Amino acid sequence: MRTEELFNAIRKEEQETVEAILTENPTLVMEKDQRGSTPLLLATYYGYNEIARIILKFNPEIDAKDASGNTALMGVCFKGFITIAELLIANNASLNLTNGNDATALIFAATFGREDIVRLLLKNGADKTMKDARGLTALDHAKMQGIKNIAELLS
């Protein structure tokens, strides 16, 4: 019951409720919803910076993957949430994990034109030589999308 309540509070961006539920039962930070998302994955999916900060205080598995194999960092790189990307990296999110298609956070950021996040990932040591399941690097994806500024960064 409290698990569903936690996920609903996250969806509604109810910061105080999220903090109260996790304070009462910190192990809920590791639970997953029907889509395989942890509380951190869900908060980052919606771009809820403060909810993500609250959840991080309860030491979640920062690199937990959803049903598609995506981490919270991959999700924010796809969506362009730079503040949360910075927060996750500051909390030691792994930069070079891959999902079911062998895509990395850098590949997501490059593919979707997130120059600020590409810069952040590179500055923090993301491996730009990693290839996805099709054998393509982040540079290849940027070129295919015609995103010249990112292609130059990755060259």
Question: Where is each model-derived feature located?
Answer:
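Intrinsically disordered, low-complexity regulatory segments in ankyrin-centric signaling systems
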Residues: 1-25, 30, 34-37, 46
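Ankyrin repeat A-helix N-terminal signature
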Residues: 8-13, 42-48, 75-81, 108-114, ...
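Ankyrin repeat structural motif
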Residues: 14-22, 48-56, 81-89, 115-122, ...
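Ankyrin-repeat inter-repeat connecting loop/turn
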Residues: 28-29, 62, 95, 128
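Alpha-helical adaptor scaffolds
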Residues: 45, 49, 53, 57-61, ...
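Leucine-rich solenoid repeat scaffolds
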Residues: 128-155
